[in-house]
């Protein structure tokens, strides 16, 4: 896989990698569970997955499913986070890697990255230029989505993340860039 990408990272740890597709709709949870039976699954990483996993899968893999979300959670959960950020007029936006729970985008945060919102996002006609503004936010955020997801995967695989009472902390917090 691409150097630095999730497949490359998994191969570096000699772990199998499965790509579940980028489409919307119901996830292929039967395939996911079949893979679990075939391999000793340490981690499920979701990137642009845009689907909601069933409680059965979430509970079975509690603390072992990492998602990347295009906002600084808890702000702007759910779909269209970049649009929500633009509509709210934020000056700082960002991305979050978090553990998946049955509550959408509410799981314990592992790492976040922030960026200044480009001033041009708020110039021009607010109705006509919305798509352009959202695209500008997405362009700034997407490279950070990959970065924060890979950082979270590394922290998880190194057993650096501890979750207690719905909150996460790092065993050696000073060793990681969290924001």
Protein language model features and the residues they cover:
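One-carbon transfer enzymes
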Residues: 1-179
């Amino acid at each position: 896989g691409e150097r630095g990408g999730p497949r490359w990272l998994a191969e570096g740890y000699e772990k199998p990698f499965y790509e579940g597709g980028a489409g919307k709709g119901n996830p292929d949870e039967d395939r996911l569970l079949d893979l679990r039976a075939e391999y000793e699954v340490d981690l499920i990483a979701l990137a642009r997955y845009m689907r909601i996993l069933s409680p059965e899968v979430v509970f079975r893999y509690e603390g072992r499913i990492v998602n990347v979300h295009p906002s600084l959670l808890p702000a702007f959960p759910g779909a269209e986070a970049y649009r929500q950020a633009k509509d709210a007029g934020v000056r700082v936006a960002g991305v979050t890697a978090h553990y998946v729970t049955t509550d959408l985008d509410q799981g314990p945060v592992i790492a976040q990255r922030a960026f200044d919102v480009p001033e041009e996002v708020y110039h021009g006609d607010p109705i006509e230029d919305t798509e352009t503004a959202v695209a500008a936010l997405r362009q700034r955020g997407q490279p950070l989505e990959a970065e924060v997801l890979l950082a979270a995967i590394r922290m998880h695989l190194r057993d650096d993340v501890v979750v207690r009472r719905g909150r996460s902390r790092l065993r050696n917090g000073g060793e990681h860039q969290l924001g």
